[in-house]
């Protein structure tokens, strides 16, 4: 099993002639073995593009909310 060293996320957006936005999310996954995996997802919304990119990795995206404990 490969161990992930880093995941970089890139987001691109374009507007068409009717000012509709389209998104592309690129995930660049680097493994400790030196292998590189790139997945791209396209969509009408940022969430759709992101979900498609993560689906190509075979992973599900979990949004984490940072919580702080006050003592």
Swiss-Prot record:
Pfam families: Corona_3 (PF04694). This is Non-structural protein 3a.
